[in-house]
Amino acid sequence: MTTLRATMTAIAIAGKGGPEVLRPETIAVPQPGPGQLLVKVAAAGVNRPDVMQRLGLYPAPKGHSEIPGLEIAGTVVASGEGTRRFMTGHTVMALVNGGGYAEYCVADETACLPIPTGRGMVEAAAIPEGFFTVWHNVFERGGLKQGEWFLMHGGTSGIGVVAIQLARAFGAKVIATVGSADKCTACLELGATRAIDYTSEDFVEAVKAETKGRGVNVILDIVGGDYVERNIRSLAEDGRLVNIAFQKGSKVTIDLMRVMLKRLTLTGSTLRIRPAEVKAGIARAVEDKALPLVGNGQVKIIVDSAFPLSEAAKAHERMDESHIGKIVLRV
């Protein structure tokens, strides 16, 4: 196995802190192990876990790259033993365990997907993290079904814009919460039945009114904190609450009696630390059931902005501003 170069530029985290701690460094090009591909990165998605890692709150799993970046798109340039599907020269998009903010990145072949026809590298890099996360949490853990009500907090986030569209595509009725009127408009354009501006409306009361008092069946929550108890109040009987982040805190107090009386399911997950075989299963489901909707235009890839790799700090600054959709680094 050979690589194009011995060294590459990558964005390192030079200590805990603000975006300014993201700095270009020259490091060795990684080598693919068994079942892995070496990808020449053309674009890398920027996600909230990258920000959490920069702040020292979400360290890289043991044995994986400390370079941030959980999704990439690019061209295969080398492969390890046992790879079967993708070969040198193939273009792929991939969910990775880290290392995406770099010129080259190693990816498990089973977590790689073909890029949908007609999609460029920037769009492709905006797909894996959101689609894997939404499919696993909304449809597998949350069990969202046709005709059910789905509530998405953070409707214009990178996760939110995917969740709204996929839920609607599979026949659910969608409610989204956001923090401004223009974001409400964006959610409605993506297919939400109702958009709630949480700065001026109580989402619990709005959900109750929209569902005629029944509540929603599935909630995907990235907020945590005091939203958890309010989510429980917003769920219908046999409802499912799925937490994937906790921007307002992970320690909460809930009324278990309400959970018991309504027979609720409270669950959640993190994707980065899951075994490769779990991610492989999610990848196949995404490829079989979700990506065709991208190919036929039913689900759009929403990219807010793209920055050069050298401006990763500016991309993180953009994460803290009012944006709609994904932020991507061009490599």
How should these model regions be labeled?
Residues A28-G45, L57-G99:
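Glycine-rich beta-strand-centered segment in the early N-terminal region that forms part
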